[in-house]
């Protein structure tokens, strides 16, 4: 018998054996695609397509324009369902990979079946190839059939297949790739174990181990690196997440949801992972002992590494749990030791199936305890120097600073952009704006503020980790301000809302003896743009008095203001409207672009020359709103432009505001 005929004969027998899997898949895909499409279409019609029409019901006018809109929204509904980025296939693909992978090689966990299959005059490689390929074909054919059924259903709703064929085929391709990566992982888990339940547990470990470890490390960094203003080691977290097929799948879908596209290197990485998984599975299958069936693990050499990794991860998790309960060193160490002991004993029971052998690997256990304790202490005492880190001045190209005394009075930067023929508003947080726009080159000022932050961070670590949080400790450290009847009220330095105000300083206490009366603490985010292209960030709580001189210099800098205030992003040639508001009322507004441009120029020039001393002496009483052409287009699209232009103007505006404008110009 030729290899080809033998392959197809074995394939036919295997498909008969797995007919229940095929039936289960058909049921799942039928409800996930054709039935789901019918439900989506009916819900859209019942809500008058409000979900696709800016949450505004689409009124049935019977006009060609209305019918065109309905068809557009129906097409969008179909595209959303079949495109890559829909999260529904995630559940389908992962579940199918586990069921198909486990069912295809379940015989390896039964000694009688192993003896039978391996007694056949068929090479192991041929058996592996048949069962492996069948697992991919079962899913791919079922998926494709139901996409064809969905195409027919969409056509019945009037949606042309040409409108969604491209996104549908690409979604099919990408989901199939992630299915195959997950499927290869399940097969490897089946090959490495001798019992089906252990194989399923191994599958869970392979799916979750690296993302969980990444999340735990991030959690430790979040707790013990008190100056972190972003994920301290995001590259490590992303790398660990992508080492799991499910984690990589979820991250890819999240990227699509965030507006990113699939890159060629992502597809190439998936193809490499699929090939590597298939080869690894084949090698394990060839070397797997026949007597491995019925044992927990098929390969003795893999037992220790897997046990050590799981035990350490368990210790990290329980250590973090107990730390969150008490925030004490002894409880963190207790959680680490207990977690390691429990995990070690549970795994030994799974491995050995004998309670007498719970501590049969004492040296490994002691090594894990020592490693876990050292891991915890390294974060608790910051052996990495994270909170003390300041780059060498020669390695810094530029820097950004965000101080709460300025940031607290800024709104998020809103700007309108056109997407798919429609205007939408994007919002940028203040910290993101500073991180991406500020380019400070005065390193003396930046490092002076950073060094003050490092000094205070050391004291904050001592307060946070060496003592209980309490009113006395908080008052000593300045972390908590307690209101008292004898408070001196609130001292306002600056005022109003907008970038011309400075801050509200709350000073509390009954007299000069109260340490809280003397100073306030502000938060400072520092971003170092290094010459090697990397960006490093830190966040400090800093005494305002300790950096006041540096802050005076900083605020006088043009680089600081242009990186802090979004108003400098406005271009004079793109303005559509300017509004002056005071005490909640509009005192002046104009659509005269020439006037708006002059107001913007005057405001920008005045803001650049402003100093901290000026702000201490002046109280802003109003705010200017600049509306550019893009935002005006968005307002008109949403039907708000007329409403904005017809806002009542304070009757006193004529005499007062023109004086202000003349003075500014």
Language-model features: locations:
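Long, hydrophobic alpha-helical segments
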Residues: 84-113, 132
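Function-determining sites in protein domains
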Residues: 364-372, 380-489, 500-665
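Internal/C-terminal transmembrane anchor helices
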Residues: 307-317, 347-387
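Central hydrophobic cores of alpha-helical transmembrane segments
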Residues: 25, 197-210, 337-339, 360-373
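Helix-loop-helix units of permease transmembrane domains in multi-pass membrane transporters
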Residues: 107-137, 289, 293-294, 450, ...
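Secretory targeting signals
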Residues: 79, 86, 133-194, 198, ...
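Terminal transmembrane helical anchor/hairpin motif
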Residues: 4, 39-80, 212-284, 289-298, ...
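Aromatic- and glycine-rich beta-strand/loop motifs that create alpha-glucan
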Residues: 1-23
